[in-house]
Amino acid sequence: MKNPSELKDLLSELEEKGGGYFVDFVTTKGIQAGIMRLHPCEIDAQEPHSADEVYYVIEGNGFINLNYKNHPIKQGTSIFVQAGSEHRFHGNTRDLLIFYALGK
């Protein structure tokens, strides 16, 4: 973990991973935080988590399906997802870049 982390470095790390769509920059006993990037038509395959989550849209737009209801999202949108809730990002027509943080 590099502290502080720069967005350009995290995006480079995503490119180097070749296949992943998220990268953590903080992983401790109490918190996990990072960025995720979804290309258009890429599938968000995450499962519900056992901890509450917060998302913030850095750039892009699309939808989040939260508990089987679609909500539009765009740059500047913040989203709270309660532990155990079904959620998926989808419908973006350009790259969707999102900050996330969740308890552990």
Question: Where do the protein language model's features map onto the residues?
Answer:
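Ligand-binding loop in jelly-roll beta-barrel domains
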Residues: 83-104
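Short acidic-glycine-tyrosine-enriched beta hairpin
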Residues: 68-83
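Short, conserved beta-strand element in jelly-roll/cupin
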Residues: 38, 49-64
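A generic "binding-loop/recognition-motif" signal
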Residues: 31, 50, 69, 85, ...
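Surface-exposed loop/turn positions
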Residues: 29-31, 42, 77, 85
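Short beta-strand/loop turn elements enriched in aromatics
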Residues: 30, 40-51, 104
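Short, surface-exposed secondary-structure edge patches
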Residues: 45, 54, 68-71
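A short, N-terminal "cap"/entry segment at the start of jelly-roll beta-barrel domains
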Residues: 1-35, 45
